Structure formats: C-alpha cells, structure tokens
Amino acid sequence: MAAKDVKFDTDARDRMLRGVNILADAVKVTLGPKGRNVVIDKSFGAPRITKDGVSVAKEIELSDKFENMGAQMVKEVASRTNDEAGDGTTTATVLAQAIIKEGLKAVAAGMNPMDLKRGIDLATSKVVEAIKAAARPVNDSHEVAQVGTISANGEAQIGRFIAEAMQKVGNEGVITVEENKGLETEVEVVEGMQFDRGYLSPYFVTNADKMTAELDDVYILLHEKKLSSLQPMVPLLEAVIQSQKPLLIIAEDVEGEALATLVVNKLRGGLKIAAVKAPGFGDRRKAMLQDIAILTGGQVISEDLGMKLENVTIDMLGRAKKISINKDNTTIVDGNGDKAEIDARVAQIRNQIEETSSDYDREKLQERVAKLAGGVAVIRVGGMTEVEVKERKDRVDDALNATRAAVQEGIVVGGGVALIQGGKALDGLTGENPDQNAGITIVRRALEAPLRQIAQNAGVDGSVVAGKVRESNEKSFGFNAQTEEYGDMFKFGVIDPAKVVRTALEDAASVASLLITTEAMIADKPEPKSPAGGPGMGGMGGMDGMM
C-alpha cells in the first residue's frame, strides 16, 4: 500500500480552499447574460468553447492532491445540480464558494464547525421554503421562451425554438437536441409514434423519390418471435388481400423464405405490404410491442400467451391511418387505439418512472410516455463551424432543462434576485447559540454572491447593485445585466425556474457544510522520482596481457 500524506486543521483547510477557488473562479466567469467564454483544450480536434458551468467544472483536475480534493467537492455541487435540475450549475458553484469562504473564516476565528453547519442547514431550509412559496406557475409559451432565453445566456432565438417545440409536443413530449449539418437552427416535430427500425428490404419502397414506404389505412401484425415461413399466416394474408388494405408486419425478424415471399407478393402487386424489425431488445422489446398494440388497438401475437400465427384473425391486428417507413425509422400516425387504454398505459409507465433508480431506464421510459402521449420534437442546432455548433448545443441543452424545470415547479424572479428575496425570510431567525447564528449570517451573505457575480461580469460594481436590490421593498425589483437597468424583472422577462434556484442552493449548502467540518485530509504521497541512470561504464582497460 502506498504511503499517505496527512494534513490537519488550518493547513488542510487552506489547501482545500485554494482548490475550491481555482475551480469556482474558472466557472463563475460564465454567469449571467454577459458571462464570458471558457476555452478548453482537447487532446484531439479543435479546442472547445463553452459557457456551460458544469462542462468547465468537469475539465478541471489539479496536480496538488489536497487542492484537487477541494476542487472535486465543488465539482460535485455542479454535477448534482445538473443531474437534478439540468441547469443552475454556475449559480450553485458561486454559492458553494461563498459559503465555504465565509465558513472557513469563522472556523479559523475559533467557532464550532458543527454548530456552523447546523446554522447553515437551518437557514438553507428557510430560504428554500421562501423560494417555493414565491414560485408561480408558467402561464404561456411566452414565459417558456423567456426562461429558455435567460438560460441560453440571452439568445432569444433559442428560447423561441424551445417554446415552439414544447407547444407542439406538450409538456410530456420528448424534445431532443442534435447537431445540424447546415447553418440554420430548426425544429422538426415527429407526430405519432416513431421507432428506430427501417424496412427490411428496399423492395417495400412505395415512394422511389424519397425512398420511403408509405402505407395508408393499414393493418399491423405484431409478432414477438422471428418469422421464417409464411405458411401459418396464409389464412390471415388472404383475409388482408380480401380487405384490399395494406399490411405492416412488425416482428423480431423476418428472414429467408418469409421475406422472399413477401417481396415477390409486393412486386407482383398482389399485396401492399412492408416488414420491419421490432424496436428495442429483450424485455424492453416486449414492452414496446405492447405500447404499439395499445396505440393501434391490436394484440401482440405471443407464444407466452398461447397464441399461434395460424389462429390469428384480422380483428386481432392493429390499425393506423398512415405509416411511413424509411431505411432507419418507422412512424405510426393516428393509431386506432382506445384513448382510455392509452391513458392507462401512460399512467402505468409513469409509475415505473417514479420507481426506477437508473437514469438510463428513466430516459427510455420517458421516451415511451412521449411516444404514446405527445410526440417527439427535434431541435437541430446549426452554425458556421463545428466549435460554434457544439457551444450552441450546450446552451440549447441548458435552456431545455431550465424550461422543463420551470414547467415542473414554476418560476421566480431571475438574475439572482430570488435568492436575495428568499434571504429576507432569515430576518429574525436565530439559532440555539452564537455559532449557529454565525452559520445563518454566512448563508445570508452568500445569497448575494450570484447577483454580485452577474453584475461584475457585466462590468458593474456588484456591491452597489446588491445593496440597491436588497434595500428595495418590491419583490420583483432587480438589475437587468443585459440592458444594465433596474426595474421589475418579470416585465424585463428575466425569470428563473424555482427548481433550478432551489436545487442550486440546497446542493451548494450541502457540500459546503461538509468542507467546513473537515479537520483532516489524506492523500497518496507523491512517488519519489527514481534517480537518473549513472554514466555508462567505460571499457575495461589494463587487461592487455590476458590471452
């Protein structure tokens, strides 16, 4: 086991604070509408330019192990806030730095760290209650656009795109962000259910220009296993031909003789047909087939339930108004499913979302809800260069997360004002002893840090701005850093999601409390450098006489 280096007391805390400051100072320059960019070197390709706090934090690794521990703890604040709220990472970092700085000063002055922590926790819970109480619901897409604009560092176009996407697919719909190959940023909405499986043979194509298979008023056969032979299906196929309607087969696979027979039938014009593989794998495939069955009013033909292909009748098939299939995707529009059954299925999946602990599973379940309930919108981010596209995509991701948070828990005054207004809930609050009171005072001071930093990044004196805002009795009075004027922040359209502000404060206070109560730090001792190799041995002289 490697030897350890142990630091105690003031020495440990000073080293840790240096690390905290290095990371926080790099992150906080991005805060606010006039926040600056950070350029990050990459081991390959062009450097990355970003204004996203968590992206900056993730890149920082310090050579001094003790300083690095402090930096990693604050990185944890940014990561947790990003995971919970999807935005507000820079605010959380600024708050954490402010609480840690003031807290360590108090510890150095001889106060009890545990009482300071209790005071900080007490004050934080009071302010969080005040933020929740001040939140009001998002009323229209104009407010959604404003939240998106603020989170995208003041780019109104990004806010508008997100509002448009949310309007089209609803609050439950899935909105994904992709890089566009062109210069323009655009929103594309996929109505109905889309899954990532294309046609099994290009011979199924009906529109040769677009290379798509388009089927109208179509029957859908959902089969859980592979189809190798069509012999058991002959009665069903004859019934479909009689109905003169097209048929889509969705199965684990359609192979060999079965696929060849379908293609020959299609080419001869006897049967309008197409076949695609079922989406997903394993249990997820079964669940998605069941989703499609409920959406189209059909049944999944499953051997687990004792169903055989030869016994399938035409009324066991699903129906849809239109199906469009290209080489990569299948889209089912206007399925024939019963609305009550679809709603029940959505409620069932939502319960699974509540219960799951896996982020990946949660994301996949949310996609399934969206496909059943709303639809899917894709925001394609364009730009002149790859670096610009990546930087804008970061901001669109942030803005999208912020608007989702706003829809969930409502909005509060933006620009750091909500924290200062929340701080007024601490007036008259006292702890059980003077050290706890000091903890409450630390939080009260720290709440001004984001507003001060926003003003500072805009080239204005942060102390003056914070003083003016603090003295005002109007709850929505603040400083608009974009236009450098004071007034009603709601009228300026400077608003933040309550969830983002609340999460930033909770996570910052939680990690800061841990750092303040640290008394010892342990890290691996640096390996001693091995001595450089000695000079090469000379030739062995003086042995001429030896034969």
Swiss-Prot record:
Keywords tagged on the record: ATP-binding, Chaperone, Cytoplasm, Isomerase, Nucleotide-binding
Please give the superkingdom of this protein's source: Bacteria
Q: Which cysteines are joined by disulfide bonds?
A: none
GO function terms (MF aspect):
ATP binding; ATP-dependent protein folding chaperone; isomerase activity; unfolded protein binding
Question: Which Pfam families does the UniProt record give?
Answer: Cpn60_TCP1
One annotated Gene Ontology cellular component of this protein: cytoplasm
Say yes or no: keyword Isomerase present.
Answer: yes
Subcellular location, in the record's words? Cytoplasm
The EC number(s) given in the record are 5.6.1.7
Q: Which reaction does it catalyse?
A: ATP + H2O + a folded polypeptide = ADP + phosphate + an unfolded polypeptide
Biological-process GO terms, alphabetical: protein refolding
Gly residues bias: start-end ranges? 533-547
Q: Where does ATP bind?
A: 30-33, 51, 87-91, 415, 496
**Record-linked HAMAP family:** CH60
Subunit notes for this chain? Forms a cylinder of 14 subunits composed of two heptameric rings stacked back-to-back. Interacts with the co-chaperonin GroES.
What's this protein's function?
Answer: Together with its co-chaperonin GroES, plays an essential role in assisting protein folding. The GroEL-GroES system forms a nano-cage that allows encapsulation of the non-native substrate proteins and provides a physical environment optimized to promote and accelerate protein folding.
* Protein family according to the UniProt entry: Belongs to the chaperonin (HSP60) family.
What name has this protein been given in UniProt?
Answer: Chaperonin GroEL
